[in-house]
Design a protein with these regions (language model features):
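Short beta-strand-centered aromatic/proline hotspots
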Residues: 18-33, 91-110, 175-187
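Intrinsically disordered, low-complexity, charged/polar segments
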Residues: 40-78, 114-164, 188-245
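Intrinsic-disorder/low-complexity loop/linker signature
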Residues: 20, 25-26, 31, 47-48, ...
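Acidic surface patches and DE-rich sequence motifs
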Residues: 14-16, 28-30, 36, 45, ...
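Extended, solvent-exposed polar beta/coil surface segments
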Residues: 1-68
Length: 245
């Protein structure tokens, strides 16, 4: 897959090769701190300074740490300051809950500055609300593809892959819908969405203009069998999660 091509709803396997580094602080307050082996310090940043250390959440069931993707070898509990260890991401199934593009790139205290933020949740975790004012948010773990960390991605599923945000379609039950994401369907009749659009679907317009014959054929072919509810079931089987609202 194009390693910068992400959409909400994508199911991915993400990994990062384990790389040698040094422990700066053993497990403290559910985190282990290591010298980060990939980013460079942006010494010209006017808004703050980074010491080159990253605190990784230790997966012990607390909300602060359950989103963490990175792991250490040996395990965090076996590490103390000064130890040499490896840090990386074993192949992990995640689903994408948010995608943000930054032009110009974000002003960060490390280099390279990220041009994209992708938020993911590990298999078994669903989006959830946290109390207002909490330092946590339930969308998941943020990564910045292309920021120097050698992530690799394998796309396992992209629901409604032939669709684009803003597409307008007609379904087999005679209802018209707007597609804004695999779980974001708006019926033009203003009636409750119910079980969602009834397949097969006919593409009516794309980007506010009449669709091309090729685009219409792709949408029709992708929805000739199956259903919206089957798509949800297939997605949930991969993610062990509920679709992001």
């Amino acid at each position: 897959m194009d390693e910068l091509d992400f959409r909400v709803g994508d199911v991915l396997s993400v990994a990062c090769p384990f790389t040698d580094t040094r422990v700066e602080q053993g497990v403290t307050w559910d985190h282990v701190s290591v010298r980060w082996p990939w980013w460079e310090i942006d010494s010209s940043n006017e808004f703050g300074q980074w010491n080159g250390i990253v605190a990784l959440g230790v997966d012990n069931g607390v909300p602060e740490a359950e989103f963490e993707l990175f792991r250490t070898d040996p395990l965090p509990e076996q590490l103390k300051a000064g130890d040499v260890c490896r840090v990386g991401v074993p192949p992990t199934v995640v689903h994408v809950t948010a995608v943000d593009h930054h032009d110009p790139p974000l002003e960060t205290v490390w280099l390279p500055h990220p041009a994209q933020t992708v938020t993911v949740l590990r298999r078994g975790l669903s989006y959830r609300e946290f109390p207002e004012g909490s330092h946590l948010h339930g969308s998941g773990y943020t990564i910045h593809p292309g920021d120097g960390i050698p992530f690799t991605f394998e796309r396992l599923m992209r629901p409604y892959a032939t669709f684009q945000a803003g597409d307008e379609v007609a379904d087999a039950a005679g209802r018209a819908w707007r597609f804004d994401g695999p779980w974001e369907w708006t019926a033009f009749d203003e009636e409750p969405a119910g079980a969602g659009p009834t397949w097969p679907l006919i593409l009516l317009s794309r980007a506010g203009a009449p669709c091309s014959a090729g685009d219409a054929e792709a949408v029709a072919a992708s929805t000739v069998s199956g259903s919206h509810q089957q798509t949800i079931r297939d997605w949930m089987a991969l993610t062990e999660a509920s679709p992001t609202p």
